[in-house]
Amino acid sequence: MTPAEFQALTGATSQQITDLETFIERLAEANAVMNLIGPDTLPDVWNRHIWDSTQLLALAPDARTWADLGAGAGFPGVVLAILLKGVPDAHVWLIDSLGKRCRFLQAVVDELGLPATVVNGRAEEQMIRVDVVTARAVAAMDKLLGYAQPYLQRGAQGLFLKGEKVEAELIEARNVWQFDSDLSVSRSDPRGRIVSVRSLRRVHSR
């Protein structure tokens, strides 16, 4: 996928494309000195990472506030912040426990003037009320729901980008958690799935 193809697919503005291109440049620079994404995925960054992140917006079109847990390389959180820039009351919290990743994220947020706050800390310890909590490539569903619990119990919808083994992960997670969920096929990779979660509560402790 090229920037022009992404723009035709999504209706992104020229400024949004410019911001996304700047983000990709900064990501490539940072990736040379720290492991943010697999270097072999950079040539397909527009489909593999940008479009993969963007598709979440269609699943929560009215959402204005998002929390990205384990924000790492900025997927999906930075992409969402770029696309939501200028939308009234929009804000994205980028939460990561590793300081060097947070410094990278903060530099991008500052350069692009994004409606985002970088939080260096553990996801499950933050008391933030948002419309949607999301994560990508962070943990299996049983652990991920533990990280997301404070947000889900404050009314957030969970939208989690997962791989083709997610159904087995959901079976395992139901040994620990009770929740309502729906699966959508990823629009960037038919093997991927997006898990929508609501109404989480723990059924017993491990």
Regions found by a protein language model. Name each.
Residues 91, 115-117, 157, 178-182:
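Conserved beta-strand segments of alpha/beta enzyme cores
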Residues 31, 84, 109, 174-177:
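Conserved hydrophobic residues forming the short capping helix/wall of the S-adenosyl-L-methionine
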Residues 97, 138, 161-165:
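Short strand-turn motif at the edge of the Rossmann-like AdoMet-binding core
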Residues 165-206:
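Active-site capping/gating segments
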Residues 54-135, 145:
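Conserved SAM/SAH cofactor-binding pocket of Class I
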Residues 1-67, 99-114:
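Class I SAM-dependent transferase core
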Residues 27, 162, 197:
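Residue-level signal for inorganic ion chemistry
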Residues 145-158:
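A short glycine-rich, Lys/Arg-flanked "PGG" loop and its adjoining helix->strand segment in the class I
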